[in-house]
Curated annotation (Swiss-Prot):
Processive glucosyltransferase involved in the biosynthesis of both the bilayer- and non-bilayer-forming membrane glucolipids. Is able to successively transfer up to three glucosyl residues to diacylglycerol (DAG), thereby catalyzing the formation of beta-monoglucosyl-DAG (3-O-(beta-D-glucopyranosyl)-1,2-diacyl-sn-glycerol), beta-diglucosyl-DAG (3-O-(beta-D-glucopyranosyl-beta-(1->6)-D-glucopyranosyl)-1,2-diacyl-sn-glycerol) and beta-triglucosyl-DAG (3-O-(beta-D-glucopyranosyl-beta-(1->6)-D-glucopyranosyl-beta-(1->6)-D-glucopyranosyl)-1,2-diacyl-sn-glycerol). Pathway: Glycolipid metabolism; diglucosyl-diacylglycerol biosynthesis. HAMAP family: Diacylglyc_glucosyltr (MF_01280). This is Processive diacylglycerol beta-glucosyltransferase. Belongs to the glycosyltransferase 28 family. UgtP subfamily. GO terms for biological process: enterobacterial common antigen biosynthetic process; glycolipid biosynthetic process; lipoteichoic acid biosynthetic process. One of its GO terms (molecular function) is 1,2-diacylglycerol 3-glucosyltransferase activity. It comes from Bacillus licheniformis (strain ATCC 14580 / DSM 13 / JCM 2505 / CCUG 7422 / NBRC 12200 / NCIMB 9375 / NCTC 10341 / NRRL NRS-1264 / Gibson 46).
């Protein structure tokens, strides 16, 4: 593999997933020996104020703007096809031009739908091999552009959707979504139980409560579950210090039944010992769940890519989608009590995993970029 390539990875922090994939690809580049790799949060660098405002509105959409987000997501075909969303096509253009001139990239990798990149190529007449690493289990048309050389997708379902709208089969590769290597390493579970003071003889429910819009009644759910003899609850609060504080009284009363944690770097450890998990249906978290084989309960997914992700996993028997507040406790309790269903769901979610996605993607990107540039040189020689 030619590791002398200059690689530019573009991302945006609308949700953590796109940035996490960019970081994962960067780390894999380092592991493979690439020396000239740059990661750019393009919109943040291009216009910090606008970026901050739109990120805030994005986060608010999980609680107060769901219908607006639904209209945007499902109405994007009309916006995109009629090119009425012209401002989006130009966002970050100046910053992109600066990055291209400074780093002279041989390859551009997008982990967010950066239409500005293929539009820049089209306007400038530059041939910079450009690749989209898609971060969900569904297709959103805003990822698609004639000047994207290849798409790396999670499943055959996404590939089929791309082919339906005219993408050539050779321009799509099913690779899975890149996740941190730690999720694919072997670990001793006994050490994890000991580290977090958990019992291997009880069912463990993991609640990923730090993400926006996961679950609002965490305290109520914990109060109900800690009374059950054979269940332990682990709540990861992330940076949500208010939530962690609100659970401390329950934890003090039931120290062997409830664990409340802040930000956890090695979250894969908790995935490994969890019997099921309540989480947000983001593409990265769901891919991490497939790597470990932990069934997921998805509460009231936001219309758009999260809803589509949730339905994909539910249809394949890998997740339970709960849309009503009062159904959460019953869904959790019945699943944890049903060993057969738990094992079926573990098998189903594990079957969705594709390993070593980052390495597979980067290896193919290098190969494809060389094919593209060789074609360019051949055309020049003949003209």
């Amino acid at each position: 593999m030619n590791t002398n390539k200059n690689i530019l990875i573009l991302t945006a922090n609308y949700g953590n997933g796109h940035v996490q994939v960019a970081k994962t690809l960067y780390q894999e580049c380092e592991r493979l020996g690439f020396k000239n790799v740059t990661v750019s949060n393009l919109y943040q660098e291009s216009n910090p104020i606008v970026s901050e405002i739109t990120q805030y509105l994005y986060l608010k959409s999980f609680s107060i703007g769901k219908q607006f987000y639904r209209l945007f997501y499902y109405g994007v075909d009309k916006i995109y096809n009629k090119r009425k969303f012209n401002i989006y096509f130009k966002m970050g253009n100046k910053r992109l031009d600066q990055l291209v001139k400074k780093h002279q990239p041989d390859i551009i990798i997008n982990t967010f739908p950066m239409i500005v990149v293929p539009e820049y190529r089209r306007r400038m007449g530059k041939v910079i091999p450009t690749f989209n690493v898609m971060t969900d289990f569904c297709l959103h048309k805003i990822w698609v552009h004639e000047h994207i050389d290849k798409y790396y997708v999670a499943t055959d379902y996404v590939k089929e959707k791309l082919l339906e709208i005219g993408t050539h089969p050779s321009n799509v590769k099913i690779t899975g979504i890149p996740i941190r290597r730690q999720f694919e390493e072997e670990m001793d579970k006994d050490k994890i139980y000991e580290k977090y003071q958990l019992s291997p003889d009880k069912k463990i429910l993991l609640i990923m409560a730090g993400a926006h819009g996961v679950l609002k009644n965490v305290k109520e759910l914990c109060e109900s579950l800690v009374t059950k003899e054979d269940v332990q609850v682990v709540v990861v609060c992330g940076k949500n210090t208010m939530l962690k504080s609100s659970l401390e009284d329950i934890e003090a009363l039931y120290p062997n039944k409830l664990r409340t944690l802040g930000y956890i770097e090695r979250i894969d450890e908790l995935f490994r010992v969890a019997d099921c998990m309540i989480t947000k249906p983001g593409g990265i978290t769901l891919t991490e769940a497939t790597a470990i084989g932990v069934p997921v309960i998805l509460y009231k997914p936001v219309p758009g890519q999260e809803k589509e992700n949730a339905l994909f996993f539910e249809d394949r028997g890998a997740a339970i989608v709960v849309n009503r507040h009062e159904e959460i406790l019953e869904s959790v309790s019945s699943l944890l009590a049903d060993e057969k269903k738990l094992n079926e769901m573990k098998k189903n979610i594990k079957s969705l995993h594709l390993s070593n996605s980052s390495e597979v993607i980067l290896t193919d990107i290098i190969e494809q970029s060389e094919i593209i540039m060789n074609k360019k040189q051949t055309v020049r020689a003949l003209s």
